[in-house]
């Protein structure tokens, strides 16, 4: 009867959902699960780092010093050229349509720090450092589709064709890496990067190869999405990994923290997906809807309200939030450039006593609701000054003698 009902609703071959219903009612269960996490890179990927650094194989100390000087000058020259190219790039602050996808930033989590609002409420923020981000390469959707299995899923999706933009972070010693890894940075004209991250970008928001990315790519008050690997806890038991209760504390011998029975009543096997002791953490996770409350321009540091996945020192991919009510409406396209910088002219006044001169402070951007520690915390009005002072409560009361 069920099969005839399904055939009356559908025409042609039986769809997948109908097959699941038939198997469920017939006593068979169709189990759906994802791919298992791996801790090592795929074997077909080329090596990134040299097994034996070239600087330690039969090279005298004088030659090493010469190579270090040449590498330092090449890195400085590449950074200078990239900065000059960024000044020539045409950028503007425009309204961003819902179909556009901008590039993101590869940041490093350096800790958590509390901030306070103007009302005195404490909010815990994550501090993220933008370390020398540059655009390494741009791959068209056609080339990405042909060359990668991931590109076959993401190059042409429901949002239209997507370009893969690779961003590098953190300048490093090129002698540590293989020739094949260094070639992509030579083509872009930038220093060798330690970390790489890829983003899906639409055609109207494509940056140029070798373009530097600044922390001001995001604005204060904007909502972002953070993706990273969770804290690596190593091999853990069922109580820590899955929150199981364990066995009774009394009348139990050496089984207090065991998970108990793992049988499936008749199958003579353990079902895939059974919660058991094993490796905990180090999984890719995404947290969306995080608000940026503060940006330190001089140190390239972003303060994000809330927590992000990963331990201190882990690499995080930061991009625009796509939630409907938290989507970016207006911003720099394709990214921020020095041509968008505006110098705010303030009247020259002598600093008040007890305040820090502005030339000694960092160039920072704050959310309007965030309290700045250079501002006074308590303001007294004339009405407060006219109030009668009360009794000194630190001293004992003394009865007045009647005359």
Swiss-Prot record:
Which SUPFAM superfamilies does its entry note? Translation proteins (SSF50447)
GO BP of this protein: translation
What Pfam family does this protein match (any one)? Ribosomal_L3
Region (Disordered): which ranges? 32-56
The organism's place on the tree of life at top rank: Eukaryota
List where in the cell it is found.
Mitochondrion
Q: What Gene3D superfamilies does its record include?
A: Translation factors (2.40.30.10)
Where mainly located? mitochondrion
Among InterPro entries, the record links this protein to:
Ribosomal_uL3 (IPR000597), Ribosomal_uL3_bac/org-type (IPR019927), Transl_B-barrel_sf (IPR009000)
Q: Which UniProt keywords apply?
A: Mitochondrion, Ribonucleoprotein, Ribosomal protein
Task: Give the record's GO CC terms.
Answer: mitochondrial large ribosomal subunit
Q: Name one GO molecular function term.
A: structural constituent of ribosome
Q: Which family does it belong to?
A: Belongs to the universal ribosomal protein uL3 family.
Annotated protein name in UniProt? Large ribosomal subunit protein uL3m
Its gene is mrps-18C
């Amino acid at each position: 009867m069920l099969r005839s009902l399904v055939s009356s609703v559908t025409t042609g071959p039986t769809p997948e959902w109908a097959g699941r219903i038939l198997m469920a009612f017939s006593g068979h269960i169709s189990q759906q699960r994802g791919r298992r996490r791996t801790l090592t890179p795929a074997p077909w990927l080329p090596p990134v780092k040299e097994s034996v650094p070239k600087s330690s194989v039969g090279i005298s100390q004088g030659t090493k010093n010469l190579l270090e000087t040449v590498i330092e000058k090449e890195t400085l020259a590449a950074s200078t050229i990239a900065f000059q190219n960024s000044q020539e790039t045409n950028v503007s602050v425009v309204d961003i349509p819902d179909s556009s996808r901008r590039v993101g930033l590869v940041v490093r989590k350096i800790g958590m720090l509390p901030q306070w609002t103007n009302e005195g409420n404490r909010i815990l923020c994550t501090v993220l450092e933008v370390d020398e981000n540059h655009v390494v390469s741009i791959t068209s959707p056609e080339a990405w589709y042909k060359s990668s299995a991931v590109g076959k899923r993401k190059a042409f999706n429901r949002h239209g064709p997507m370009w893969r933009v690779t961003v590098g972070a953190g300048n490093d010693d090129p002698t540590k890496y293989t020739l094949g890894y260094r070639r992509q940075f030579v083509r872009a004209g930038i220093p060798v990067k330690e970390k790489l991250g890829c983003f899906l970008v639409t055609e109207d928001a494509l940056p140029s190869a070798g373009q530097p990315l600044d922390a001001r790519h995001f604005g204060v008050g904007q909502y972002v999405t953070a993706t990273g690997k969770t804290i690596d806890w190593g091999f853990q038991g069922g109580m820590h990994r899955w929150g199981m209760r364990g066995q009774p504390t009394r009348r139990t011998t050496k089984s207090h923290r065991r998970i108990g029975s793992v049988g499936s009543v008749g199958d003579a096997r353990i079902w895939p997906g059974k919660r058991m002791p094993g490796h905990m953490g180090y999984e890719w996770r995404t947290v969306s809807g995080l608000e940026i409350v503060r940006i330190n321009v001089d140190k390239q540091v972003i303060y994000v309200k809330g927590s992000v996945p990963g331990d201190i020192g882990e690499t995080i991919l930061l991009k625009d939030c796509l939630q409907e009510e938290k989507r970016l409406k207006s911003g720099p396209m394709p990214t921020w450039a020095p041509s968008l910088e505006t110098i705010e002219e303030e009247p020259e006044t002598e600093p008040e006593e007890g305040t820090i001169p502005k030339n000694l402070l960092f160039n920072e951007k704050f959310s309007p609701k965030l309290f700045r520690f250079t501002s006074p915390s308590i303001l007294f009005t004339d009405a407060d000054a006219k109030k009668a002072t009360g009794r000194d409560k630190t001293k004992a009361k003394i009865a007045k003698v009647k005359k």
